């Protein structure tokens, strides 16, 4: 399983590919919607790409609980 640092780096790459945001902007405390301006459609693409990259399943009902980058890192690490 990937370390939390590896998960964060992987998520930053995925967010960069989807939104064009610099990977340095994707920090654990950042909110996907408020800080990174990621809409629901982009978020679903990010989730699908994260599932593929990390070999996990993130149920649709869990996606709404992934408010911050850290929430996503913690979920993936614990999956």
From Swiss-Prot:
Keywords: Cytoplasm, Fatty acid biosynthesis, Fatty acid metabolism, Lipid biosynthesis, Lipid metabolism, Phosphopantetheine, Phosphoprotein. 4'-phosphopantetheine is transferred from CoA to a specific serine of apo-ACP by AcpS. This modification is essential for activity because fatty acids are bound in thioester linkage to the sulfhydryl of the prosthetic group. The modification O-(pantetheine 4'-phosphoryl)serine is found at residue 40. One of its GO terms (biological process) is lipid A biosynthetic process. Pfam families: PP-binding. Residues 2-79 form the Carrier domain. SUPFAM superfamilies: ACP-like. One of its GO terms (molecular function) is acyl binding. Gene3D superfamilies: ACP-like. Pathway: Lipid metabolism; fatty acid biosynthesis. One of its GO terms (cellular component) is cytosol. It is found in: Cytoplasm. InterPro entries: ACP, ACP-like_sf, PP-bd_ACP. Carrier of the growing fatty acid chain in fatty acid biosynthesis. Belongs to the acyl carrier protein (ACP) family. This is Acyl carrier protein. It comes from Myxococcus xanthus.
């Amino acid at each position: 399983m990937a370390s939390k640092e590896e998960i964060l780096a992987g998520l930053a790459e995925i967010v960069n590919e989807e939104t064009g945001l610099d990977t340095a902007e994707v920090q654990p405390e950042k909110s996907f919607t408020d800080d990174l301006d990621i809409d629901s459609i982009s978020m679903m693409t990010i989730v699908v790409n994260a599932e593929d990259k990390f070999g996990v399943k993130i149920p649709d009902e869990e996606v709404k609980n992934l408010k911050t980058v850290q929430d996503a890192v913690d979920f993936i690490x614990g999956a």
